[in-house]
A protein has these predicted regions:
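Short polar/charged helix/loop
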Residues: 1-188
Length: 188
């Protein structure tokens, strides 16, 4: 996994060195779980390490809804959540850290709210990776697959599985931003 994480680290580092905005779009099939967690945790880690040029997005090959189990995992991890209404509600995810605010809802990866060019496409599931052999506008495509917590839906270990996936993604996104931060400190 470190190889893929290092690709993301290097992408961010080069963009910073060139004083360019850094856009990463986390892509999964339904944009309901893993891609949202990747987006939110990367943005949180960027805020924590004060790497302000980083902007994280998410999308899917299909539009469904941000799964309430994944939302609940973020709440258990300490995020405040305000839920919208409808079949595909918009959630406002926030943290006291640097007044982080992210509006999350399920959308296709090429939605108007997502970057159209000069971004890193982070593929969080193999299904989306296979369904989209080409992501137009992406500077880089990284395969960073996560096991789908959906497999635990309705079981006794559902909460544990979602929390484990949330923690895994958080750990990896903080690793990425810590390495970027350390590289920036060496440059200064």
């Amino acid at each position: 996994r470190k190889v893929w994480l290092n690709e993301i680290i290097e992408y961010i580092k080069v963009k910073i060195e060139n004083n360019q905005e850094i856009n990463l779009n986390f892509i999964c099939t339904h944009n309901s779980r893993r891609s949202h967690l990747g987006q939110i945790w990367l943005q949180m880690a960027a805020a924590y390490y004060e790497v302000e040029l980083v902007k994280a997005y998410s999308g899917g090959t299909e539009e469904t809804a941000f799964n309430p189990r994944a939302v609940a995992a973020l709440q258990r991890a300490g995020f405040a959540v305000r839920e919208g209404i409808g079949g595909n509600p918009k959630y406002e995810i926030s943290s006291d850290l640097h007044t982080l605010r992210i509006v999350s809802f399920s959308k296709k990866y090429d939605n108007l709210e997502n970057p159209k060019k000069h971004f890193c496409a982070v593929m969080t599931c193999s299904e989306a990776d296979e369904a989209c052999p080409i992501i137009f506008g992406a500077d880089l495509r990284v395969k960073l697959f996560y096991e789908d917590p959906k497999s635990a839906d309705g079981t006794d270990y559902e909460v544990n599985t979602y929390d484990e996936r949330c923690f895994q993604i958080a750990t990896e996104m903080f690793h990425v931003m810590k390495k970027v931060f350390m590289k920036l400190q060496k440059i200064k």
